[in-house]
């Protein structure tokens, strides 16, 4: 999980595993500090796993919620493509593609106007992705995925933490279950995560994206725009 991926397809299973681990640690902390109830499980329902009995028993001393929630969010991460869909909903993907990829490519081609949605889609799917895939110097691609992977890990954790803390806040206000911890600390954690995500994006993801775009030959960019009548 700590070894960075070399492609998007390599990144996905690693991201799901990272989501499982970060979620488990997060929910474990929530139980320890009184934000979530300790929901026990009868020992007879614990399957015998050789060499891991003590470890499993230790995990379950904190209740079933941390491990169950980790499994749940890891599945959601994979089935719903959580990082990608949330990023689209809140506009991160559009901003990323538009300002860091499409606009620089259009500038090289001498196009200063804003591209239409169809033109933008064509530039991404027919020019950017194919050309990046064919880059001979994979160093730039690997550096890109190195930074993007960690950004998505923290981004998914931020999304999961936000949803969880929202539920906890509602639960405390409506007395659905006992919450002894301070809600202020939880929302400060969300603010810290958002700030950290922004820092990673600006300091690492942005320059790596721009660097990768620059590896596409100017001649191919201009040829693509001319052939597709994007002026």
Describe the predicted segments one by one.
Residues 164, 168-174, 182, 192, ...:
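Terminal transmembrane helical module of multi-pass membrane proteins
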Residues 1-108, 177-196, 203-212:
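N-terminal first transmembrane alpha-helix
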Residues 141-163, 185-190, 194-215:
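Charged, low-complexity, helix-prone segments enriched in Lys/Glu/Asp/Gln
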């Amino acid at each position: 999980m700590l070894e960075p991926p070399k492609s998007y397809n390599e990144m996905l299973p690693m991201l799901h595993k990272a989501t499982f681990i970060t979620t488990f640690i997060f929910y474990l902390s929530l139980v320890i500090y009184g934000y979530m109830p300790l929901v026990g499980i009868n020992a007879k329902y614990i399957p015998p796993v050789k060499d891991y009995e003590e470890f499993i028993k230790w995990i379950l001393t904190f209740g079933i919620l941390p491990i169950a929630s980790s499994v749940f969010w890891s599945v959601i991460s994979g089935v719903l493509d959580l990082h990608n869909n949330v990023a689209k909903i809140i506009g991160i993907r559009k901003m990323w593609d538009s300002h860091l990829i499409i606009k620089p490519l259009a500038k090289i081609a001498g196009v200063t106007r804003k591209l239409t949605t169809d033109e933008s889609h064509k530039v991404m799917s027919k020019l950017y992705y194919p050309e990046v895939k064919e880059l001979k110097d994979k160093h730039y691609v690997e550096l890109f995925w190195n930074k993007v992977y960690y950004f998505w890990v923290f981004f998914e954790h931020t999304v999961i933490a936000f949803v969880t803390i929202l539920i906890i806040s509602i639960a405390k206000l409506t007395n659905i279950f006992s919450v002894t911890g301070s809600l202020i600390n939880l929302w400060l954690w969300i603010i810290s995560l958002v700030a950290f995500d922004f820092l990673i994006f600006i300091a690492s993801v942005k320059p790596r994206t721009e660097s990768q775009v620059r590896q596409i030959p100017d001649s191919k960019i201009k040829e693509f725009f001319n052939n597709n009548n994007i002026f």
